[in-house]
């Protein structure tokens, strides 16, 4: 009589493996349903993780969609250098779109303020690009833990013909089943990182050795303190107020955007383990440094309803 064959031990996925598997599943489901998908690439840590997951989802083949960056022309110089370097290293199709009307009118965060700048150079620019290339599914790196309006948005988010989000038209997503049925002109924003936290992102970056913009690591940088924020003076376009002089301080960024609208934090964290340690101890949102989130009550939800990322 032959000996009984032992049943294989049941493999348990780690927390990060479960998140990774869910994100890869979302990518594959969305691409299977999409007619013309695109990935919105904002260059930050979440976009870097999103890109890494997309490459895993479709390996060993090429990405079945391009990356698109909405360039306001006010991103940190290190962000643009990182974007171009990564696209070249990975052989990616990268589309860069800028609202030329806004650029011609000189719309910027300093001259027009954060609300007008964000609307013209981000929201309107994104709607222009989606219409121009006729994308019906746009992947984004938003996470539910970032901000209240993002917390209630579905993984597959229906947008109307003007790319607007209506919270009342959200669809149920039971058992990871996603509804991609749409009317003519409608489209979807898809968020594979919805269930990740800031800590998950940093742990995954460390585990997978994912390249990120150096601005996330602490270094001596020229900053001015304005309205309670440490703003890095990244180029000569930033006007100094009377008596204001940039000071070299040890800072890093928890989140990245247009540099005049993004506050740094004083920190000695120059390695991933140190950043993870700070994240574990943090008692404030990573978006505390985003000036655009302070454009009045419900600012982010209002922006999303107008077509924002």
Curated annotation (Swiss-Prot):
The residue ranges crossing the membrane are: none
A Pfam match is PAPS_reduct
Is the keyword Electron transport assigned to this protein? no
Q: What is its EC number?
A: 2.7.7.4
Say yes or no: keyword Kinase present: no
What's its catalytic activity?
Answer: sulfate + ATP + H(+) = adenosine 5'-phosphosulfate + diphosphate
Q: Give one GO term, molecular function aspect.
A: sulfate adenylyltransferase (ATP) activity
Q: Provide the alphabetized UniProt keywords.
A: ATP-binding, Nucleotide-binding, Nucleotidyltransferase, Transferase
Pathway entry? Sulfur metabolism; hydrogen sulfide biosynthesis; sulfite from sulfate: step 1/3
Q: Which InterPro entries match?
A: PAPS_reduct_dom, Rossmann-like_a/b/a_fold, SO4_adenylTrfase_ssu, Sulfate_adenylyltrnsfr_sub2
Highest taxon above the source species: Bacteria
Can you supply a Gene Ontology BP term from the record?
hydrogen sulfide biosynthetic process
Family that this chain belongs to: Belongs to the PAPS reductase family. CysD subfamily.
Quaternary structure (record): Heterodimer composed of CysD, the smaller subunit, and CysN.
Provide the function of this protein: With CysN forms the ATP sulfurylase (ATPS) that catalyzes the adenylation of sulfate producing adenosine 5'-phosphosulfate (APS) and diphosphate, the first enzymatic step in sulfur assimilation pathway. APS synthesis involves the formation of a high-energy phosphoric-sulfuric acid anhydride bond driven by GTP hydrolysis by CysN coupled to ATP hydrolysis by CysD.
Q: Which PANTHER family match?
A: SULFATE ADENYLYLTRANSFERASE SUBUNIT 2
Q: What is this protein called?
A: Sulfate adenylyltransferase subunit 2
Organism of origin: Methylorubrum extorquens (strain PA1)
Name the encoding gene, please: cysD
